[in-house]
Amino acid sequence: MNTETGTISFGGALPFLDGVSFIDEFYPKFQVPISVVNDGKAAALSELWLGNLKGIENGLALVLGTGIGGGLILDGKLYQGKHFQAGELSFMMKQSDKVSFDDMYGRTGSAVGFVKKVNQELGTEDLTDGAAAFEAINQKDPIVYPIFEAYAREIAYMICNIQAILDLEKIVIGGGISAQAIVTEEIRTQYRAIRAGLPFVADTLTEVEIDSCRFLNDANLLGALYQLLLNVDEELVVNG
């Protein structure tokens, strides 16, 4: 998603948005400033502005949803990359005998997919019922809690790999399931367990701080506002 032109290069689950410029579509009609930013980058912006990445030079907002969104803060600013594709963590690949999206982090780290697995085990009629899933998880249900631990471990491995490349100060967890405090707690627990099992890694690489987004699932909305303010008057917003 090009934040300069407002063009969506790939609409994902909404393919009718491929190649659409929101600025070209809406500005002639409404004649007001328009900004476009994806969810992961928006979450990072809001947390940098007023949240749990405020004052951080190098950090990451990791958004758990249908896939995994990411917003990188490098040198105190949102890093988007040459093609505005930095932080597209769903497309990180895992070793596999076959080339398949099933073996990419966007599938194995999907919060939606994880909730469905839990509800399948519980026999819940609505497989997308997050409340039912987390009621069982918070009660440490012996059948579904291992599924939750495995999911948190999957995210923790991703964090280990990201940290080996970027040496971040802090990572904040967002997305709908971040409203459940146990999510960030278990990811942190699994991350530390991985490091404990690999002493040479723990001795070499500094442990990154893992926290929840201050604004949880609303971080995306606030970050979109911040992007708009930056577009209108960056100097005023940054320098107050």
Each predicted region: which residue ranges?
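ATP-binding/phosphotransfer module of carbohydrate and carboxylate kinases, centering on a glycine-rich
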Residues: 2-5, 24, 28-32, 49-56, ...
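Generic detector of well-ordered alpha-helical packing
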Residues: 3, 39-40, 48, 89
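Short glycine-enriched, charge-decorated loop/helix-capping segments at active-site entrances
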Residues: 8-15
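Charged helix-capping and loop-helix junction motifs
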Residues: 15-19, 153
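General beta-strand structural signal in soluble alpha/beta enzymes
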Residues: 34-38
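Active-site glycine-centered loops adjacent to acidic/histidine catalytic or metal-binding residues
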Residues: 39, 65, 224
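Acidic/histidine-rich catalytic cores of soluble enzymes
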Residues: 44
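Glycine-rich phosphate-binding loop of actin/hexokinase-like ATP-binding domains
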Residues: 54-108
